[in-house]
Every structure is written in structure tokens, then in C-alpha cells.
């Protein structure tokens, strides 16, 4: 079972310990790499947004090597290559940004963009990912 929307914003904490996980509408049967890549990629998206806002973000948080090591230590299971799952996550984030952009247009918050890709705030991240594994994505 894959959670589907594994990210820090969907976890409730009490005394710095997770006590509940929320937002299960993307749950599905899938490999563990789906959720692991999603949580890392979600952080990369927010890191990209921080950069667009001129902020440093948290570049030392949710690094693949750290998440992978922690996951493997806690579960005793090795993870496979996450690249395909990052691309998948990037495409799903495109859908999310298109939907939120359409809603903003509908309610008059923004003008309809001439190029829908301008709504992909993580576009440069996705392009780097598609360009190849040595482009500094993870």
C-alpha cells in the first residue's frame, strides 16, 4: 500500500513525534519507492519555490541519501532507483499546479496565462530532472 501524498504537511505531530498521517485520496497499491520519492520530490518543489522567492529554503533537509539511509535502517529494505518515481512525481505536481492555476483563474486571482507551463513553478526542477541524472536534482 502506498500513501500517495507522503509529505511533512500531511503528518500530525505531538511532542515532535508523528501521531497521524492525513490525506489518503492518492493511496494506491504500489512500490515503496513511490512514497519515498514523493516525499523527497515534494521537498524539492518547495525548495524550488523558496528559491523563486529569493529565500534559501532548507537545502540540507530531505536529501535523498539521508532519507534512503534512514528508510533502509528502519525497515531493513533497500530502495531501488528513484529516478522514474521523481519524474512521475514531477508530472503529478504539474497536474496539481494546473488545477490550482485553473482555480485561481476561475476566481479572478490571476489572468489566464498565455502559456500553461508558466503555472509549473517547479518547471526548472523538472527540466533538470529530464535532462539527466547528473543535473543536480537529488
Indicate residue ranges for each PLM-predicted region:
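Pocket-edge positions in alpha/beta enzyme catalytic cores
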Residues: 28-31, 56-59, 114, 118
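All-alpha amphipathic helical-bundle segments outside canonical DNA-binding/catalytic cores
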Residues: 77-89
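Regulatory N- and C-terminal appendages and interdomain linkers associated
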Residues: 103-138
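Short amphipathic alpha-helical segments and their helix-coil junctions
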Residues: 18-22, 63-77, 121-127
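Active-site acidic catalytic loop and adjacent metal/ATP-binding pocket
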Residues: 1-34
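Active-site activation/catalytic loop segments of kinase-like enzymes and analogous catalytic loops
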Residues: 34-75, 89-107
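Short beta-strand segments
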Residues: 1-4, 21-23, 40, 86, ...
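Conserved NTP-binding catalytic cores of kinases and kinase-like/nucleotidyltransferase enzymes
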Residues: 17-19, 78-79, 133-138
Amino acid at each position: 500500500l502506498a500513501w500517495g501524498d507522503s509529505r511533512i504537511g500531511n503528518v500530525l505531530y505531538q511532542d515532535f513525534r508523528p501521531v497521524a498521517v492525513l490525506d489518503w485520496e492518492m493511496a494506491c497499491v504500489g512500490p515503496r519507492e513511490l512514497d519515498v520519492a514523493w516525499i523527497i520530490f515534494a521537498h524539492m518543489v518547495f525548495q524550488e519555490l523558496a528559491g523563486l522567492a529569493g529565500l534559501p529554503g532548507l537545502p540540507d533537509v530531505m536529501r535523498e541519501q539521508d532519507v534512503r539511509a534512514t528508510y533502509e535502517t528502519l525497515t531493513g529494505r533497500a530502495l531501488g532507483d528513484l529516478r522514474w518515481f521523481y519524474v512521475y512525481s514531477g508530472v503529478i505536481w504539474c497536474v496539481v499546479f494546473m488545477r490550482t492555476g485553473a482555480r485561481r483563474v476561475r476566481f479572478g486571482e490571476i489572468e489566464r496565462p498565455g502559456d500553461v507551463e508558466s503555472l509549473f513553478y517547479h518547471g526548472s526542477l523538472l527540466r533538470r530532472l529530464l535532462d539527466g541524472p547528473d543535473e543536480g536534482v537529488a
